[in-house]
From Swiss-Prot:
Subcellular localization, as worded in the UniProt entry: Cytoplasm
Protein name (record): Serine hydroxymethyltransferase
Modified residues (N6-(pyridoxal phosphate)lysine): K242
Catalytic activities: (6R)-5,10-methylene-5,6,7,8-tetrahydrofolate + glycine + H2O = (6S)-5,6,7,8-tetrahydrofolate + L-serine
The keyword Transferase is assigned to this record: yes
Source organism per UniProt: Beijerinckia indica subsp. indica (strain ATCC 9039 / DSM 1715 / NCIMB 8712)
Family as reported in the entry's similarity comment: Belongs to the SHMT family.
Any one Gene Ontology molecular-function term assigned to this protein's record: glycine hydroxymethyltransferase activity
General function of this protein: Catalyzes the reversible interconversion of serine and glycine with tetrahydrofolate (THF) serving as the one-carbon carrier. This reaction serves as the major source of one-carbon groups required for the biosynthesis of purines, thymidylate, methionine, and other important biomolecules. Also exhibits THF-independent aldolase activity toward beta-hydroxyamino acids, producing glycine and aldehydes, via a retro-aldol mechanism.
Length: 433
């Protein structure tokens, strides 16, 4: 005879009440260690930022429990009236933020937002143009290892060897030769402004859509510290983290009603099923934050700080690709120092300064080694770093890398330890969480 097992109230209470440290101490420990890293390292990865406590609360909310296939007012599940509020707020706020007519806030990432544009506007085998990954573009802009380069015919444009700037005459010549259906402006490591008006004129001349991927500089656009892709672009995508300082995710914007309809169908049901409503709620919070006056000050300071970091590094004898930066990021070419990006990233990491190895224009080193590093100002600016702090950061970077060049990895421990002590002291003046 089988004993009857009843689910008792104490067990249910335990499920809903147990905190993470009790329920899963291993994950809790990993989070604790990561918090310590974020608190005590100077974060210079250009694609990273630090979100507000409010964004964290929204993303960790009970909105994660709700399935909501479809769009506000047109869901395939019941009980969506409150998640509809969150998504409608996200749409309303992001439209206001970028002064555009239509927005889809459901993409789970910038890559999926870009895929939605391809699905909406292209057919397999169609030709499109984007910045070469080796010149600062992005995987999703036609890299042969990415879906965009496998399903479509990608024609890449590059930068001039003389100044590492995009040669718009060369872009125009390529467009006239290949007759693309779509032209992309945007990248992951291009430190200068984009000539949106010229790109649109070139696109119009060959009957192409003009698509801007502003994942890296969206927050700067929102804060009035970078030219807007509107009214030039037919369609715009972005991530919601990076300079926009929200949760990890994507979005698509347009002023064209027909394109908006195609984008909505491409996102759902074309690419995704149920949207992540807890993330969309967090996006709404971040968009609301970005509409406030203090975000404009933040965006402007991001640009000032990046310029300060770049100019100080030049003073210290480092080569900066294109000679500087107009936005939040820069590429440091380490070939004159006879260093690799891989070695520099590791040395700076040991000194409590986080960055990423990155190829530089016309790099001959492998992507796993590289001849440069990419640096960005958004996260440290969120902490409160100003121009003086970024001058200090540049000095710490120079001291570490000059020591590495002189002493080698095995002989640079004392320099790295000294820099680490000062880097941690700097972070402690600007605490997070």
């Amino acid at each position: 005879m089988n004993a009857k097992v009843e689910v008792g109230q104490p067990a249910a209470n335990s499920f809903f009440a147990a905190n993470l440290a009790d329920a899963d101490p291993e994950i809790a420990k990993a989070i604790e260690l990561e918090l310590g890293r974020q608190r005590h390292e100077i974060e210079l990865i250009a694609s990273e930022n630090i979100v507000s406590k409010a964004v964290l609360e929204a993303q960790g909310s009970i909105m994660t429990n709700k399935y909501a296939e479809g769009y506000p007012g047109k869901r395939y599940y019941g009980g969506c009236q409150f998640v509809d509020i969150a998504e409608n707020l996200a749409i309303e706020r992001v439209r206001k933020l970028f002064d555009c007519q239509f927005a889809n806030v459901q993409p789970n990432s910038g890559s999926q937002a870009n895929q939605a544009v391809f699905l909406a506007l292209l057919q397999p085998g169609d030709v499109f143009m984007g910045l070469d990954l080796a010149a600062g573009g992005h995987l999703t802009h036609g890299s042969p290892v990415n879906l965009s380069g496998k399903w479509f015919k990608a024609v890449s444009y590059g930068v001039r060897q003389s100044d590492h700037l995009i040669d718009m005459d060369a872009v125009e010549a390529l467009a006239k030769e290949h007759k693309p259906k779509l032209i992309i402006a945007g990248g992951s490591a291009y430190p200068r402004h984009w000539d949106f008006a010229r790109f649109r004129a070139i696109a119009d001349s060959v009957g192409a859509y003009f698509f801007v991927d502003m994942a890296h500089f969206a927050g700067l656009v929102a804060g009035g510290a970078h030219p807007s892709p509107f009214p030039h672009a037919h369609v715009v995508t972005s991530t919601t983290h990076k300079t926009l300082r929200g949760p990890r995710g994507g979005l698509v914007l347009t002023n064209d009603a027909d394109i908006a309809k195609k984008i909505n169908s491409a996102v759902f049901p074309g690419l995704q099923g149920g949207p992540l409503m807890h993330v969309i709620a967090a996006k709404a919070v971040a968009f609301g934050e970005a509409l406030r006056p203090d975000f404009r000050l933040y965006a402007q300071q991001v640009v000032v700080n990046a310029g300060t970091l770049a100019s100080r590094l030049v003073e210290k004898g480092f080569a900066i690709s294109s000679g500087g930066t107009d936005n939040h990021l820069m590429l440091v070419d380490l070939r004159p120092k006879q260093l690799t990006g891989k070695a520099a990233e590791a040395a700076l990491g040991r000194a409590s300064i986080t960055c990423n190895k990155n190829g530089v224009p016309f790099d001959t080193a492998s992507p796993f080694v590289t001849s440069g590093i990419r640096l960005g100002s958004p996260a440290a600016t969120s902490r409160g770093f100003g121009t003086k702090e970024f001058q200090d950061v540049a000095d710490l970077i120079a001291e570490t890398l000059d020591g590495l060049a002189k002493n080698g990895e095995e002989g640079n421990a004392a320099v790295e330890a000294s820099v680490k002590e000062r880097a941690i002291a700097l972070t402690q003046r600007f605490p997070i969480y």
